Every structure is written in structure tokens, then in C-alpha cells.
Amino acid sequence: MKTSKVKQLCAVALAATLGLSVLAGCGAKKEEKATTAAKQELIYNLAADPKTLDPAINQAVDGSIIAANIFSGLCDLDDKDKAIPGQAEKWEVSADGLTYTFHLKKDLKWSNGEPLKASDFEYSWKRVLDPATASVYSFQLLYIKGAAEFNAAKTPEEAKAKRDAVGVKATDDTTLVVTLAAPCPYFLELTAFTTYFPVSQKVVEANKDWAKDAKTLVSNGPFKMTEYKIKDQIVLEKNENYYNKDKVKLDKITMKMVTEDTSAWASYKSGQFDMIDKVASSEIVKAVKDKTAITFPNLGTQFIDINVSDKVKDIDPNAAKVLGNVKFRQALANAIDRKTIVENVTKSGQTPAFSFVSTGINDPEGKDFTSKKYFEPAGDIEKAKKLLAEAGYPDGQGLPPLVVLYNPEGGNGEIYQAIQDMWKKIGVNVELQTQEWKVFQTTRNSLKYEMARGAWSADYADPMTFIDMWESTSPSNEIGYNNPEYDKLVASAKAETDAKKRFEMMHKAEDILMADMPIIPLYYATYTKGIKDYVKGVRVSPLGPVYFDKAYIEGKK
């Protein structure tokens, strides 16, 4: 998501070499100044209408941006994306790295004023794991003892029997004991992740659509939602029941949903928006130079999904045969000139991909995990043609019509038109189709496509956040990939307590993935956001979320 996620046996270096979270428009000490001169209200174009605001269901960065500001986990993340106390004031970790005992702050409350207890976390985490919830992100909690068995239950009766065996127990109102199946080097950071946020059992069970209405959405973060107009705006206001409310300076954030980049840019330039999530690609170079936009590092990869599941046969049996041909997939990968894409199309500081796992994650020896080049970033047309011929389609002869699906937001059209032209050079012609973001997510998740835009922003700073999404049982496996050898390596890496061996296993897993090429990496991502110079203290994380808990307005004319 989409996108730093300790004392224990398999601790590894979690520092991302691409940098820390960045504070926008904030000079030293300035953040602590009194902010009485300006109205503390901010208008931010989110550029999307989130599919959901339910932390258990959300799987997209836009939803996580809102969730990160209206909810709060056991831990928060500092500006290095490392765990610090959040709803929990402290914790202890057992010597074997398996048991975490969290102690909640006293007198925590929901935004409606009702008490928040450790049992709310127990309920929320088990709700994510409950098969009935169908959470795409349930895999992020499978580190917990008994979680995998509960999540895999086939019947309501089986789920009920396995629920109590999950290693999450509220022993009193302020104590939560968590038992892991194996030591996890980034578990504390995970508790700051969207899927681990608490929800109110009372609210959830009273209304299945609780997260779609400001009147029913109850949260526990620095802000609360007070208005939700579909495809128009979401309004957040300061949560007076937040434990750290005195540090929150903004009174109101209006999040707009203008999806067309050029329209959003025009509104930003005219002063209608104080901040925009995406800058029109045609404006990026000049905007960054003029300091009306800022490019931030992102621990993420953009790629193309190839549907290798049996479901693609229902769309077109001929397309299924082609897409199931590994030589064909490798040909497509080698025909793409990623250097041209990042220099002439995206133009926002991205770097051409040569692997799936993003650059910026260090191994135990301090070296970047991503060092092996699986293909030439600038492409290799001759190699692509050779692979296409070996696949049985010399110069594209005999290929059926193929369709690539993408969502048009964020300038994706220009990217996929460029790829379409590159593939034509080896004789592969594809039709481009678009779907708006919410529909696109549903189509992709249900495997009702041939090829589609894919993107992944790390949930924590470890290669596993990229590697385990392609396990055959992963809800995030939106391509239907199934390789038993790959699954075995990932499972072994998760159980391995020797950091060096664990990284070696993940390297081998990526070797298999890139040989099979069910996804085609394009580039390592960045974020370019428009931020007015009077907007201070906004923190943009390489993992995706944008934090407004320390933001304020100063010097706005």
C-alpha cells in the first residue's frame, strides 16, 4: 500500500537508505512556535475517493492517508519510521522475541468520548483475521500465533473454534499480551500500520456501513471525520478526545477528491488548495525548480500485473495461453525502456527498476538488498524479440488481442501509452482500457483482467513486505501466482532467526519471481506533492502516509 514497517533474535537493519520521513516546510524549532496569526485550516487534494476507510478492509495509500490521521495504533512512527509509543505508553518483549506485553496509556477515549480499552485491540485484530471479514491485508497479522489457522478456517464453526487460540489477549483494560508464531524483526512497526488500528466493536456491529458516514465513524486519532461527500470531499476536525490533543495545531482539514491532475494543479496555483497529493506530470520539473512542489522518497515499486490464474480463461482462453507463457512475459519485460519512462514521462525523480524489491532497504551488512539486475533498465529489444520467437510468436505473429487495464488518475495514461508503443516495436499490440480507481481495485482483486497496472508501497522497511505478497495464499496476490518452491522459501524466511540466512532466502525467492516474471517492474517510485510555503510540519513518509498531527499554517496571506 501501498506503504518502516526491537529486541529479538532475528533483528536486522531497518534503516531505509533512501532517507527518512520528510517534514515539509518546517525549519528547526519553528514547529514549536505559537500559531495564532493564521486560521488553522488546510485544504488538501487527496486526488481520490477512497474505496473504504475501514482499517481492516483498506488496501490503498489514499485510504491509509486518512486512516493515519483519524486512527492511532499501539505504536506511532517517528521521523525515521521507527516505533515510538502511541496508544501504548510502554511494552516489554520476552527474551525469545515471541511475547510482547503492551501497556496502554491511561484514560484513552474514542472520538465519541467512550473509553478505549485493550479489548478493543483484541477485537479489532481478530476481526481482521476473521475469514468473514475477507480482509486483503489479513496477511499482515499472520505473524501472530494461531492467526494463520483462524484466518484459513473454512466454516463459521471452525472459525469460532480457532478464534480463542489466536495469540492476542487483553488481560485487563490497559494490558494487551501478544504471542507471535516466530520472532519478527519489525513487529513493533507493524502495530503502527493501518490494518492494526483499533475499531469500536459497538460501532462496527451496529452498522455494517459505519465507515461510510461521518455520523457513525468513530476513531481514536488526532482528527475525527465530520463530513463525507462521496467523490467530493472528506472533512476532518481536531479530535478533542485524542490523548495528545494539545500538540495538534490544525483545527480542520478538508480533503478534496479532484482526480484530474491538471485541474487539481490549476486549483492549487489559484489558491483554492493549500496542498495537493499529485502534481501534473507536465508541471513537475518546473514546479520542483520553483519550489511550489516537493519530491519525496518512496519505498515502492510500480509494475505491471499479469494475470496468470485460471480465471483469465473466462475472459479469453487464447489470451490465457499467451499470458501463461513465461517466455512471452519475459519478452514484454525486456521490451520496456524504463529509462525513457522516468526521464520523459514521469519526470519526478523516479529511477528505472531492475528488480521487484525497491531500492532503499539495507541487509544485515549495511548493503542495499536490491543489487542484482534482472533486466536492463533501458530495455533490450533484440533480447525481447528473441524471447518472443522462443515463445512461439515471432514478430508477434499469432498473438490474440490483449488488453491492459489501468486507472487514469496520477498520469498513468501517459505511462501506459509509452509502454504500448514500446511493445509495438517487437510486434506486440495491446489495447488500453481504463477504470476509475474504486472499480479498478475491485476488478484487479477479483482477477477479472488480462494485464493491469500494479503498484506497491512498503508497509515496513524489510524486503518481506515485497516478497510475501506473492505467496499463493496471500490476499494481496492479485495475479494468481502459484509457485510451491517460492511459497516454501517465503515461509522458511519468516521462520528463520538468523538474519543473514533470512536475507539469502528472500534473495532466492526474488530470483524465482523474476524468472517466472508474473509481474513486470517498471520503476522505483517517488512522491511529488504541491505544498504551499505557509504549510508547516507535514510529514510525508517513504511508506505512503502523510501525517498532519504536527502540521500548522503560518504566514498565509
Positions of the model-derived regions?
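N-terminal lobe/hinge region of extracytoplasmic solute-binding protein
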Residues: 45-95, 218
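Aromatic- and charge-enriched surface segment that lines or borders ligand/interaction sites
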Residues: 89-140, 177, 264-267, 321-324
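Alpha-helical secondary-structure segments
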Residues: 117-124, 173-179, 221-222, 250-252, ...
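Surface-exposed binding/hinge segments that line
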Residues: 122, 127-129, 136-201
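Gly/Pro-rich hinge or "lid" segments in bacterial periplasmic/extracellular proteins
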Residues: 173-174, 180-248, 252, 270
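Ligand-site clamp/hinge motif
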Residues: 241-286, 429
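Detector for C-terminal structural segments
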Residues: 335-365, 411-420, 441-557
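Structural transition elements
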Residues: 351-390, 409-412
